[in-house]
């Protein structure tokens, strides 16, 4: 709090391991959030990690107190989750994730905003973008809503105090995290899962965490296994291509070529495999075509288009 008052920090990440049981742990997190927002007047950014299996009312209360809420997937497939975390299931993770999505959409609609997050809208006009209306229609993302909204979710918001105004539900959206290297899934599986999460659950971000071996276990990599930091980096680059460059998972990888080349960034690797699309005429190429040129990003592509003389 002193760091916040002195302007050393602008936000914080709040997380916890399970203490006693999920309900008790989530209750303590909500109490902490309420103390920060009310007693200590912490109006900065708060990212809170939820506890799978906690009651709906506690998860909803956390959403009204925090700016961003995370329901961590941890592993990309139900098989790996069952193998490495048998106490968890896809159902206990995806159900609250769907409720967060629908409650965010409902509260955004009530104040006159689009139900989907703005980040999605910034990419909607790129042909083939995973956030485009046509892609959302094909994947069923637009019709995959309903039935999981927290009814009367606003009633779970903590009571306001004199100078404390009620907040929107998770205004910075929701995110999740996947561990890289703990199970044997390919990069293709990871990127496909990421794309589905963005489309079906309107996630703001998917985070990746390289697995660091710390325990001897036959189901886990050996202790001397190198930490896949470069692989994690390539997945973040691919994630960026999905969100801002109009790429799709099937363009970057395939079942025949399931893993990224760790010695080359995914966009450059794609360009080398599609030399028939190059060179391009910079003066006439469309914005989405410019985005596929290695070394050109959204800002540069926008400047090139604006600088043209007709």
Residue ranges of predicted features:
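Short alpha-helical segments in extracytoplasmic peptidoglycan/chitin-binding modules
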Residues: 290, 303-304
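A conserved active-site cap/scaffold subdomain adjacent to cofactor or substrate pockets
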Residues: 176, 187-209, 214-220, 229, ...
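Residue-level signature of tetratricopeptide-repeat
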Residues: 307-308
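Acidic-histidine catalytic/liganding microenvironments
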Residues: 6, 200, 293
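Conserved Radical SAM active-site core
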Residues: 1-176, 180-183, 215-222
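A glycine-rich phosphate-binding loop feature that marks nucleotide/adenosyl-phosphate handling sites
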Residues: 115-122, 211-216, 251-267
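Long, highly charged, low-complexity intrinsically disordered interaction regions
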Residues: 221-292
